Amino acid sequence: MASDAAAEPSSGVTHPPRYVIGYALAPKKQQSFIQPSLVAQAASRGMDLVPVDASQPLAEQGPFHLLIHKLYGDDWRAQLVAFAARHPAVPIVDPPHAIDRLHNRISMLQVVSELDHAADQDSTFGIPSQVVVYDAAALADFGLLAALRFPLIAKPLVADGTAKSHKMSLVYHREGLGKLRPPLVLQEFVNHGGVIFKVYVVGGHVTCVKRRSLPDVSPEDDASAQGSVSFSQVSNLPTERTAEEYYGEKSLEDAVVPPAAFINQIAGGLRRALGLQLFNFDMIRDVRAGDRYLVIDINYFPGYAKMPGYETVLTDFFWEMVHKDGVGNQQEEKGANHVVVK
Protein backbone atom coordinates (compact mmCIF):
# COMPACT_ATOMS: atom_id res chain seq x y z
CA MET A 1 0.00 0.00 0.00
CA ALA A 2 1.27 3.48 -0.79
CA SER A 3 2.24 5.86 2.01
CA ASP A 4 -0.46 7.78 3.84
CA ALA A 5 -1.80 11.00 2.36
CA ALA A 6 -0.72 14.36 3.74
CA ALA A 7 -1.99 15.20 7.20
CA GLU A 8 -5.12 17.30 7.52
CA PRO A 9 -4.66 21.01 8.36
CA SER A 10 -4.96 22.01 12.00
CA SER A 11 -8.07 24.15 11.37
CA GLY A 12 -10.20 21.06 11.77
CA VAL A 13 -11.72 21.46 8.31
CA THR A 14 -11.84 18.12 6.52
CA HIS A 15 -10.29 18.05 3.06
CA PRO A 16 -10.02 15.08 0.74
CA PRO A 17 -6.51 13.59 0.90
CA ARG A 18 -4.15 14.44 -1.94
CA TYR A 19 -1.56 12.10 -3.35
CA VAL A 20 1.77 13.00 -4.91
CA ILE A 21 2.89 11.13 -8.04
CA GLY A 22 6.60 11.67 -8.60
CA TYR A 23 7.89 11.29 -12.14
CA ALA A 24 11.51 10.97 -13.28
CA LEU A 25 11.66 11.30 -17.05
CA ALA A 26 14.12 12.58 -19.63
CA PRO A 27 13.22 16.08 -20.90
CA LYS A 28 11.86 14.85 -24.24
CA LYS A 29 9.77 12.15 -22.54
CA GLN A 30 8.51 14.60 -19.96
CA GLN A 31 7.43 17.02 -22.68
CA SER A 32 5.40 14.39 -24.53
CA PHE A 33 3.90 12.56 -21.54
CA ILE A 34 3.20 15.26 -18.95
CA GLN A 35 0.54 17.11 -20.91
CA PRO A 36 -1.66 19.77 -19.24
CA SER A 37 -4.67 17.54 -19.87
CA LEU A 38 -3.10 14.69 -17.88
CA VAL A 39 -2.03 17.01 -15.05
CA ALA A 40 -5.54 18.48 -14.84
CA GLN A 41 -7.32 15.15 -14.86
CA ALA A 42 -5.05 13.70 -12.19
CA ALA A 43 -5.51 16.84 -10.07
CA SER A 44 -9.29 16.48 -10.32
CA ARG A 45 -8.91 13.04 -8.71
CA GLY A 46 -6.75 14.39 -5.87
CA MET A 47 -3.36 13.49 -7.37
CA ASP A 48 -0.54 15.94 -8.07
CA LEU A 49 2.12 15.13 -10.65
CA VAL A 50 5.48 16.39 -9.36
CA PRO A 51 8.83 16.17 -11.21
CA VAL A 52 11.82 14.55 -9.55
CA ASP A 53 14.86 16.83 -9.30
CA ALA A 54 17.61 14.82 -10.98
CA SER A 55 20.29 17.01 -9.37
CA GLN A 56 19.25 15.98 -5.85
CA PRO A 57 19.28 12.58 -4.12
CA LEU A 58 16.00 10.82 -4.86
CA ALA A 59 15.66 9.37 -1.36
CA GLU A 60 15.55 12.87 0.12
CA GLN A 61 12.73 14.07 -2.13
CA GLY A 62 9.00 13.78 -1.71
CA PRO A 63 6.97 12.65 0.04
CA PHE A 64 5.71 10.58 -2.89
CA HIS A 65 2.86 8.11 -2.87
CA LEU A 66 3.91 6.64 -6.24
CA LEU A 67 7.06 6.96 -8.34
CA ILE A 68 7.10 6.44 -12.12
CA HIS A 69 10.32 6.65 -14.08
CA LYS A 70 12.13 6.11 -17.34
CA LEU A 71 15.75 6.94 -16.60
CA TYR A 72 18.73 4.63 -16.96
CA GLY A 73 22.28 4.19 -15.71
CA ASP A 74 24.01 2.80 -12.64
CA ASP A 75 23.61 6.01 -10.65
CA TRP A 76 19.85 6.10 -11.19
CA ARG A 77 19.53 2.42 -10.31
CA ALA A 78 21.44 3.05 -7.07
CA GLN A 79 19.15 5.97 -6.27
CA LEU A 80 16.08 3.78 -6.74
CA VAL A 81 17.55 1.19 -4.37
CA ALA A 82 18.21 3.88 -1.76
CA PHE A 83 14.72 5.31 -2.20
CA ALA A 84 13.08 1.90 -1.85
CA ALA A 85 15.08 1.21 1.32
CA ARG A 86 13.95 4.48 2.89
CA HIS A 87 10.37 4.36 1.56
CA PRO A 88 9.48 0.67 1.20
CA ALA A 89 5.72 1.37 1.06
CA VAL A 90 5.94 3.59 -2.04
CA PRO A 91 5.36 1.69 -5.32
CA ILE A 92 8.05 2.17 -7.99
CA VAL A 93 6.84 1.70 -11.57
CA ASP A 94 8.60 -0.25 -12.88
CA PRO A 95 11.45 -2.31 -11.30
CA PRO A 96 14.76 -1.74 -13.17
CA HIS A 97 15.56 -5.46 -13.33
CA ALA A 98 12.25 -6.07 -15.13
CA ILE A 99 12.85 -3.22 -17.57
CA ASP A 100 16.30 -4.60 -18.41
CA ARG A 101 14.82 -7.55 -20.28
CA LEU A 102 13.37 -5.18 -22.89
CA HIS A 103 16.79 -3.67 -23.60
CA ASN A 104 17.86 -6.80 -25.46
CA ARG A 105 15.88 -7.71 -28.57
CA ILE A 106 16.48 -11.42 -28.10
CA SER A 107 15.42 -11.68 -24.45
CA MET A 108 12.60 -9.23 -25.22
CA LEU A 109 10.85 -11.60 -27.61
CA GLN A 110 11.90 -14.82 -25.93
CA VAL A 111 9.22 -14.21 -23.32
CA VAL A 112 6.57 -14.34 -26.07
CA SER A 113 7.65 -17.87 -26.95
CA GLU A 114 7.26 -18.87 -23.30
CA LEU A 115 3.61 -17.80 -23.02
CA ASP A 116 0.83 -20.37 -22.91
CA HIS A 117 -1.63 -20.56 -25.79
CA ALA A 118 -5.30 -20.68 -24.87
CA ALA A 119 -6.95 -23.82 -26.23
CA ASP A 120 -10.21 -21.98 -26.97
CA GLN A 121 -8.60 -19.40 -29.28
CA ASP A 122 -8.71 -19.90 -33.05
CA SER A 123 -5.86 -17.42 -33.54
CA THR A 124 -2.25 -18.26 -32.69
CA PHE A 125 0.76 -16.09 -31.94
CA GLY A 126 4.53 -16.27 -31.94
CA ILE A 127 7.58 -14.35 -33.12
CA PRO A 128 9.34 -14.16 -36.50
CA SER A 129 12.33 -16.41 -37.12
CA GLN A 130 15.46 -14.55 -36.04
CA VAL A 131 19.15 -14.92 -35.17
CA VAL A 132 21.56 -12.72 -33.25
CA VAL A 133 24.81 -11.62 -34.92
CA TYR A 134 27.59 -10.45 -32.60
CA ASP A 135 30.34 -9.64 -35.11
CA ALA A 136 30.90 -8.95 -38.81
CA ALA A 137 32.46 -12.36 -39.42
CA ALA A 138 29.19 -14.05 -38.49
CA LEU A 139 27.42 -12.23 -41.35
CA ALA A 140 29.40 -14.40 -43.77
CA ASP A 141 28.41 -17.60 -41.97
CA PHE A 142 26.01 -19.35 -44.35
CA GLY A 143 25.13 -21.88 -41.68
CA LEU A 144 24.01 -19.21 -39.22
CA LEU A 145 21.62 -17.67 -41.73
CA ALA A 146 20.49 -20.88 -43.41
CA ALA A 147 17.23 -20.98 -41.47
CA LEU A 148 16.22 -17.45 -42.51
CA ARG A 149 14.55 -16.32 -45.72
CA PHE A 150 15.19 -12.94 -47.29
CA PRO A 151 14.17 -10.17 -47.02
CA LEU A 152 15.31 -9.60 -43.44
CA ILE A 153 14.89 -6.80 -40.94
CA ALA A 154 18.18 -5.88 -39.24
CA LYS A 155 17.75 -4.32 -35.79
CA PRO A 156 20.38 -3.25 -33.24
CA LEU A 157 20.64 -5.85 -30.47
CA VAL A 158 20.40 -3.17 -27.79
CA ALA A 159 17.02 -1.44 -27.52
CA ASP A 160 17.65 1.39 -25.07
CA GLY A 161 15.47 4.10 -26.61
CA THR A 162 18.33 6.02 -28.21
CA ALA A 163 18.24 7.14 -31.84
CA LYS A 164 20.88 4.52 -32.64
CA SER A 165 18.72 1.71 -31.29
CA HIS A 166 15.91 2.70 -33.67
CA LYS A 167 18.10 2.58 -36.79
CA MET A 168 17.00 -0.47 -38.77
CA SER A 169 17.47 -1.85 -42.28
CA LEU A 170 15.42 -3.94 -44.67
CA VAL A 171 17.88 -6.34 -46.28
CA TYR A 172 16.70 -7.81 -49.58
CA HIS A 173 19.70 -9.97 -50.48
CA ARG A 174 22.77 -11.48 -48.87
CA GLU A 175 24.89 -8.76 -50.52
CA GLY A 176 23.16 -6.20 -48.33
CA LEU A 177 24.53 -7.77 -45.16
CA GLY A 178 27.93 -6.21 -45.75
CA LYS A 179 26.67 -2.74 -44.81
CA LEU A 180 25.41 -3.84 -41.41
CA ARG A 181 27.17 -3.15 -38.12
CA PRO A 182 26.79 -5.86 -35.46
CA PRO A 183 25.80 -6.62 -32.79
CA LEU A 184 22.33 -6.93 -34.24
CA VAL A 185 19.31 -9.14 -34.69
CA LEU A 186 18.31 -10.43 -38.12
CA GLN A 187 14.58 -11.07 -38.25
CA GLU A 188 12.59 -12.47 -41.17
CA PHE A 189 10.41 -9.82 -42.77
CA VAL A 190 6.85 -11.16 -42.93
CA ASN A 191 4.30 -9.64 -45.29
CA HIS A 192 1.48 -8.29 -43.13
CA GLY A 193 -0.71 -6.14 -45.35
CA GLY A 194 1.02 -2.90 -44.40
CA VAL A 195 -0.75 -2.75 -41.01
CA ILE A 196 0.71 -3.02 -37.52
CA PHE A 197 -1.29 -3.42 -34.32
CA LYS A 198 0.12 -1.42 -31.43
CA VAL A 199 -1.14 -2.76 -28.12
CA TYR A 200 -0.74 -0.43 -25.12
CA VAL A 201 -0.77 -1.93 -21.63
CA VAL A 202 -1.34 0.21 -18.53
CA GLY A 203 -1.74 -2.08 -15.54
CA GLY A 204 -4.93 -4.01 -16.24
CA HIS A 205 -6.01 -1.78 -19.13
CA VAL A 206 -5.33 -2.76 -22.75
CA THR A 207 -5.80 -0.58 -25.84
CA CYS A 208 -5.16 -1.75 -29.42
CA VAL A 209 -4.69 0.75 -32.24
CA LYS A 210 -4.03 0.21 -35.94
CA ARG A 211 -1.12 1.96 -37.68
CA ARG A 212 0.35 1.87 -41.14
CA SER A 213 3.49 -0.21 -41.44
CA LEU A 214 5.99 -1.37 -44.03
CA PRO A 215 4.49 -2.25 -47.41
CA ASP A 216 4.47 -5.91 -48.36
CA VAL A 217 7.45 -7.00 -50.44
CA SER A 218 6.51 -8.69 -53.72
CA PRO A 219 8.83 -10.99 -55.69
CA GLU A 220 9.18 -8.16 -58.21
CA ASP A 221 10.24 -5.72 -55.49
CA ASP A 222 12.68 -8.27 -54.12
CA ALA A 223 14.29 -8.89 -57.50
CA SER A 224 14.75 -5.22 -58.40
CA ALA A 225 15.70 -3.85 -54.97
CA GLN A 226 19.14 -2.77 -53.86
CA GLY A 227 20.92 -4.75 -51.16
CA SER A 228 19.40 -2.94 -48.18
CA VAL A 229 17.41 0.15 -47.21
CA SER A 230 17.79 1.97 -43.88
CA PHE A 231 14.91 3.41 -41.87
CA SER A 232 14.14 4.37 -38.27
CA GLN A 233 10.52 3.27 -37.83
CA VAL A 234 8.36 0.61 -39.40
CA SER A 235 6.06 3.34 -40.67
CA ASN A 236 8.58 5.36 -42.69
CA LEU A 237 10.41 2.96 -44.96
CA PRO A 238 11.31 4.67 -48.27
CA THR A 239 9.44 3.19 -51.21
CA GLU A 240 9.17 3.94 -54.89
CA ARG A 241 5.39 3.76 -54.62
CA THR A 242 3.66 6.82 -53.20
CA ALA A 243 1.54 6.49 -50.10
CA GLU A 244 -1.55 7.08 -52.22
CA GLU A 245 -0.58 4.31 -54.63
CA TYR A 246 0.15 1.77 -51.91
CA TYR A 247 -2.47 2.61 -49.35
CA GLY A 248 -5.08 3.05 -52.04
CA GLU A 249 -4.74 -0.68 -52.49
CA LYS A 250 -5.00 -1.57 -48.82
CA SER A 251 -7.05 0.62 -46.51
CA LEU A 252 -6.07 0.91 -42.88
CA GLU A 253 -9.73 1.15 -41.97
CA ASP A 254 -10.40 -2.21 -43.64
CA ALA A 255 -7.85 -4.03 -41.50
CA VAL A 256 -9.56 -6.35 -39.02
CA VAL A 257 -8.34 -6.01 -35.45
CA PRO A 258 -7.53 -9.30 -33.66
CA PRO A 259 -10.23 -10.57 -31.28
CA ALA A 260 -10.30 -8.71 -27.96
CA ALA A 261 -9.96 -11.90 -25.91
CA PHE A 262 -6.91 -12.88 -27.95
CA ILE A 263 -5.22 -9.50 -27.47
CA ASN A 264 -6.01 -9.59 -23.76
CA GLN A 265 -4.54 -13.07 -23.47
CA ILE A 266 -1.20 -11.93 -24.88
CA ALA A 267 -1.17 -8.63 -22.99
CA GLY A 268 -1.95 -10.28 -19.66
CA GLY A 269 0.59 -13.03 -20.25
CA LEU A 270 3.33 -10.54 -21.08
CA ARG A 271 2.47 -8.38 -18.09
CA ARG A 272 2.79 -11.27 -15.70
CA ALA A 273 5.89 -12.76 -17.34
CA LEU A 274 7.73 -9.44 -17.61
CA GLY A 275 6.61 -8.06 -14.26
CA LEU A 276 5.86 -4.69 -15.89
CA GLN A 277 2.89 -2.34 -15.67
CA LEU A 278 3.71 0.14 -18.45
CA PHE A 279 4.61 -1.17 -21.90
CA ASN A 280 3.33 -1.76 -25.39
CA PHE A 281 3.96 -4.39 -28.02
CA ASP A 282 3.80 -4.35 -31.80
CA MET A 283 2.00 -7.21 -33.51
CA ILE A 284 1.42 -8.08 -37.17
CA ARG A 285 -0.82 -10.56 -38.97
CA ASP A 286 1.01 -13.00 -41.24
CA VAL A 287 -0.75 -12.75 -44.61
CA ARG A 288 0.27 -16.33 -45.37
CA ALA A 289 -1.95 -17.52 -42.49
CA GLY A 290 -4.67 -15.04 -41.60
CA ASP A 291 -5.14 -16.25 -38.03
CA ARG A 292 -1.42 -16.23 -37.19
CA TYR A 293 0.00 -13.16 -35.41
CA LEU A 294 3.61 -12.26 -34.70
CA VAL A 295 4.91 -10.03 -31.92
CA ILE A 296 7.85 -8.09 -33.36
CA ASP A 297 8.73 -5.57 -30.64
CA ILE A 298 8.05 -4.68 -26.99
CA ASN A 299 8.72 -1.23 -25.55
CA TYR A 300 8.81 0.02 -21.98
CA PHE A 301 6.85 3.18 -21.09
CA PRO A 302 5.96 4.01 -24.73
CA GLY A 303 4.49 7.21 -26.13
CA TYR A 304 1.18 7.01 -24.29
CA ALA A 305 0.11 10.47 -25.46
CA LYS A 306 -0.55 8.80 -28.85
CA MET A 307 -3.02 6.42 -27.22
CA PRO A 308 -6.65 7.61 -27.43
CA GLY A 309 -7.90 8.78 -24.04
CA TYR A 310 -4.55 8.27 -22.37
CA GLU A 311 -5.29 10.83 -19.67
CA THR A 312 -8.19 8.82 -18.25
CA VAL A 313 -6.35 5.51 -18.49
CA LEU A 314 -3.22 6.79 -16.75
CA THR A 315 -5.19 8.66 -14.10
CA ASP A 316 -7.12 5.48 -13.27
CA PHE A 317 -3.81 3.62 -13.08
CA PHE A 318 -2.30 6.17 -10.69
CA TRP A 319 -5.43 6.01 -8.52
CA GLU A 320 -5.30 2.24 -8.29
CA MET A 321 -1.59 2.25 -7.46
CA VAL A 322 -1.94 4.61 -4.51
CA HIS A 323 -4.98 2.80 -3.13
CA LYS A 324 -4.00 -0.84 -3.18
CA ASP A 325 -1.09 -3.23 -3.41
CA GLY A 326 -0.33 -4.14 -7.00
CA VAL A 327 -2.53 -2.53 -9.59
CA GLY A 328 -4.68 -4.81 -11.69
CA ASN A 329 -4.62 -7.87 -9.43
CA GLN A 330 -8.23 -7.36 -8.42
CA GLN A 331 -9.20 -6.53 -11.99
CA GLU A 332 -7.80 -9.75 -13.39
CA GLU A 333 -9.44 -11.86 -10.72
CA LYS A 334 -12.82 -10.32 -11.53
CA GLY A 335 -12.26 -10.48 -15.29
CA ALA A 336 -12.47 -6.70 -15.59
CA ASN A 337 -9.59 -6.36 -18.02
CA HIS A 338 -10.78 -5.06 -21.34
CA VAL A 339 -9.51 -4.08 -24.75
CA VAL A 340 -10.32 -0.75 -26.33
CA VAL A 341 -9.88 -0.83 -30.10
CA LYS A 342 -9.20 2.37 -32.04
From Swiss-Prot:
Keyword Glycoprotein: no
Top-level class of the enzyme under EC nomenclature: transferase
ATP-grasp domain residues: 116-332
Tissue specificity of this protein: Expressed in the embryo of 15 day after pollination. Expressed in kernels at earlier stages but at very low levels. Expression in the embryo peaks at 15 days after pollination and then declines. No expression is detected from endosperm and vegetative tissues.
Sorted UniProt keywords: ATP-binding, Kinase, Magnesium, Metal-binding, Nucleotide-binding, Transferase
Result after altering K306A: Strongly reduced InsP6 kinase activity
Reported phenotype of the disruption mutant: Plants display reduced phytic acid content in seeds.
Catalytic activity line of the entry: 1D-myo-inositol 3,4,5,6-tetrakisphosphate + ATP = 1D-myo-inositol 1,3,4,5,6-pentakisphosphate + ADP + H(+); 1D-myo-inositol 1,3,4-trisphosphate + ATP = 1D-myo-inositol 1,3,4,5-tetrakisphosphate + ADP + H(+); 1D-myo-inositol 1,3,4-trisphosphate + ATP = 1D-myo-inositol 1,3,4,6-tetrakisphosphate + ADP + H(+); 1D-myo-inositol 1,2,3,4,5-pentakisphosphate + ATP = 3-diphospho-1D-myo-inositol 1,2,4,5-tetrakisphosphate + ADP
An example Gene Ontology biological process: seed development
Cofactor(s) needed by this chain: Mg(2+)
EC number(s) reported in the record: 2.7.1.134, 2.7.1.159, 2.7.4.21
Entry binding sites for 1D-myo-inositol 6-phosphate: K28, K70, G161, H166, K198, Y200, N280, N299, G303, K306
Residue ranges of the region described as Catalytic specificity elements (CSE): 219-247
Role, per record: Kinase that can phosphorylate various inositol polyphosphate such as Ins(3,4,5,6)P4 or Ins(1,3,4)P3 and participates in phytic acid biosynthesis in developing seeds. Phosphorylates Ins(3,4,5,6)P4 at position 1 to form Ins(1,3,4,5,6)P5. This reaction is thought to have regulatory importance, since Ins(3,4,5,6)P4 is an inhibitor of plasma membrane Ca(2+)-activated Cl(-) channels, while Ins(1,3,4,5,6)P5 is not. Also phosphorylates Ins(1,3,4)P3 on O-5 and O-6 to form Ins(1,3,4,6)P4, an essential molecule in the hexakisphosphate (InsP6) pathway.
Family the entry assigns: Belongs to the ITPK1 family.
Subunit structure: Monomer.
Protein name per Swiss-Prot or TrEMBL: Inositol-tetrakisphosphate 1-kinase 1
Organism annotation: Zea mays (Maize)
Encoding gene, per UniProt annotation: ITPK1
